[in-house]
Amino acid sequence: MSVTMREMLEAGVHFGHQTRFWNPKMAPFIFGHRNRIHIVNLEKTMGMYQEAMKYIRQLSSNRGTVLFVGTKRQARETIAAEAQRAGMPYVDQRWLGGMLTNFKTIKTSIKRLKEMEASIEDGSVQKLSKKEALMFEREKIKLEKSIGGIKDMGGIPDAIFVVDVGYHKGAITEAAKLGIPVIGVVDTNHSPEGVTYVIPGNDDSSKAIMLYARGVADAILEGRANATNDLVESIKGGDDFVEVSEQA
């Protein structure tokens, strides 16, 4: 589902930060300022947004994984919901250092969480004492909060989508070290450096965040649907009947 300029305006994508907090590296994407607030050039945002969505569709059609990252209060619920809708992993609470660069250690925690979930399913947790059960529950809640969104990721993602790159410098740095492409919403007070696909725009408005996250989820679903359609067509194309004549 494509996003229109009107939708971007209504979501407040064009509203940047106060002019005194600006990052000069965002100058090419700034239209001007009003009441000491920088105004983002939506014509540039639209083009760059479309380029990012094109990349995500292509990645998804090749069964790529996109990790959604948004831990600010106004982004958490949206990031989790849209990532789940697209069947993708997400980080909505806190970025743990080494989440990408030290994934081997993170996998140990994921294994522990899955073991705990299995204990609940098979009822073995019922055998714990009251004190043990309380400790079990506390540990499970803590693990769910920190890695619940990535427990089915399986490995390093093919790309990460980040809302507010300044707030998630750790994620950007780790992605850069591993050569993982970053699709990032960059407001006027942050640097676009380290972001492969820059989406210049408001990173504080919940409406704007919903627009970005919904767009990424839609692009993933479209890419997956296109891949399925291509597969069906290729199977149909291979069903042509060929008569083989018997040799005497």
Swiss-Prot record:
Listed GO CC annotations: cytosolic small ribosomal subunit
GO BP terms: translation
N-terminal signal peptide: none
Keyword flag Membrane: no
Pfam families cross-referenced by the UniProt entry: Ribosomal_S2
Keywords: Ribonucleoprotein, Ribosomal protein
GO molecular function: structural constituent of ribosome
Coiled-coil region(s): none
Protein family: Belongs to the universal ribosomal protein uS2 family.
UniProt-recorded name of the protein: Small ribosomal subunit protein uS2
Organism whose genome encodes this protein: Janthinobacterium sp. (strain Marseille) (Minibacterium massiliensis)
